[in-house]
């Protein structure tokens, strides 16, 4: 099998006015995280170069906030063009919240190849997690990304207090969008957040990956946030469960494993690391 590696850059951090209960970037909670409006373009380009050197085929430009406005659109398109100029063969992913088709077309024109917008949780559970924007807005943005000609990456977060039935519901809703990639995140507790300070059981996490794979047999399944927390050194079990992609390096506001250590683990297992999104 081949494993796909992706890196992310939090190009705008901790300045979100929404109230998603799982997210330390919300200004409504007092999580101890870095907060800044924008990174410099130079910093973003250097991070992309490091990601490519660490065998990442994807590099995600993430902004904090509900969705795209004119300032965010201008900044992300600038960043995308700068990265593509210096690292032309890396696949760029935009993750910039809710968006209209015309905005997403602007991102595509600037060099964004894929758009990540997670459903986060099941429609029936969503109102218990977020009140400042609707689940329907999130779903529509996913449809908009496809209409704009972008590859869709959409998944969610497990372990927020949802029931088993709601997990099944969310997986069905994700599958209905026929995404290219499905990021699976596991909730990372933080004392500043109004959710239980509990972590999903590893066996449950593996079952989720298996169930998701049954629904999207041809999609990339990427285990992202919470991988190290939930699985520790046993994380390669996700590959047997059906995952074929991971995020390397740090996440938005939590630390990840060193990329070289993950690569070493994969090489010891004899796993081939993909060199293109389309292999």
UniProtKB/Swiss-Prot annotation:
Co-factor binding comment: Binds 1 [4Fe-4S] cluster. The cluster is coordinated with 3 cysteines and an exchangeable S-adenosyl-L-methionine. Binds 1 [2Fe-2S] cluster. The cluster is coordinated with 3 cysteines and 1 arginine.
Chain sites annotated for binding [4Fe-4S] cluster: 16, 20, 23
Domain of life, source organism: Bacteria
Cofactor: [4Fe-4S] cluster; [2Fe-2S] cluster
CDD domains in alphabetical order: Radical_SAM
Entry keyword Glycosyltransferase: no
Keyword Transferase: yes
Catalysed transformations (reactions): (4R,5S)-dethiobiotin + (sulfur carrier)-SH + 2 reduced [2Fe-2S]-[ferredoxin] + 2 S-adenosyl-L-methionine = (sulfur carrier)-H + biotin + 2 5'-deoxyadenosine + 2 L-methionine + 2 oxidized [2Fe-2S]-[ferredoxin]
Enzyme's top EC category: transferase
Listed Gene3D superfamilies: Aldolase class I
Enzyme Commission number(s) from the entry: 2.8.1.6
Ligand binding ([2Fe-2S] cluster): 60, 95, 153
InterPro entries cross-referenced by the UniProt entry: Aldolase_TIM (IPR013785), BATS_dom (IPR010722), Biotin_synth/BioAB (IPR002684), Biotin_synthase (IPR024177), Elp3/MiaA/NifB-like_rSAM (IPR006638), rSAM (IPR007197)
GO molecular function, one term: 4 iron, 4 sulfur cluster binding
Pathway noted in the entry: Cofactor biosynthesis; biotin biosynthesis; biotin from 7,8-diaminononanoate: step 2/2
Domain Radical SAM core: 1-227
GO biological process: biotin biosynthetic process
Keywords: 2Fe-2S, 4Fe-4S, Biotin biosynthesis, Iron, Iron-sulfur, Metal-binding, S-adenosyl-L-methionine, Transferase
Subunit field text: Homodimer.
Role played: Catalyzes the conversion of dethiobiotin (DTB) to biotin by the insertion of a sulfur atom into dethiobiotin via a radical-based mechanism.
NCBIfam families in alphabetical order: bioB (TIGR00433), PRK08508.1 (NF006308)
Entry similarity comment: Belongs to the radical SAM superfamily. Biotin synthase family.
Name used for this protein in its record: Biotin synthase
Protein's organism: Nitratiruptor sp. (strain SB155-2)
Organism placement in taxonomy: Bacteria, Pseudomonadati, Campylobacterota, Epsilonproteobacteria, Nautiliales
């Amino acid at each position: 099998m081949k494993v796909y590696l992706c890196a992310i850059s939090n190009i705008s951090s901790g300045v979100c006015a929404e109230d998603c209960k799982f997210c330390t970037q919300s200004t409504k909670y007092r999580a101890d995280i870095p907060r800044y409006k924008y990174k410099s373009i130079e910093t973003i380009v250097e991070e992309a170069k490091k990601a490519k050197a660490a065998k990442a085929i994807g590099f995600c430009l993430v902004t904090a906030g509900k969705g795209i406005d004119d300032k965010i659109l201008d900044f992300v398109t600038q960043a995308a063009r700068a990265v593509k100029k210096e690292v032309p063969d890396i696949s760029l992913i935009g993750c910039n919240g809710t968006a209209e088709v015309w905005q997403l077309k602007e991102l595509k024109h600037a060099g964004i190849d894929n758009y990540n917008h997670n459903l986060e949780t099941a429609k029936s559970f969503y109102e218990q997690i977020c009140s400042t924007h609707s689940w329907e807005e999130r779903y529509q943005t996913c449809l908009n990304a496809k209409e704009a000609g972008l590859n869709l990456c959409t998944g969610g977060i497990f372990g927020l207090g949802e029931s088993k039935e709601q997990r099944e519901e969310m997986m069905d809703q994700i599958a209905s969008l026929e995404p290219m990639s499905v990021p699976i995140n596991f909730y990372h507790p933080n004392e500043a957040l109004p959710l239980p300070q509990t972590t999903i059981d590893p066996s449950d996490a593996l079952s989720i990956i298996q169930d998701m794979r049954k629904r999207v047999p041809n999609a990339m399944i990427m285990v992202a946030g919470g991988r190290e927390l939930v699985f520790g050194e046993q994380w390669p079990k996700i590959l047997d469960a059906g995952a074929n992609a991971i995020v390397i390096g740090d996440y938005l506001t939590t630390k990840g494993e060193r990329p070289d250590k993950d690569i070493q683990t994969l090489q010891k297992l004899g796993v081939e690391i993909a060199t293109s999104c389309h292999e």
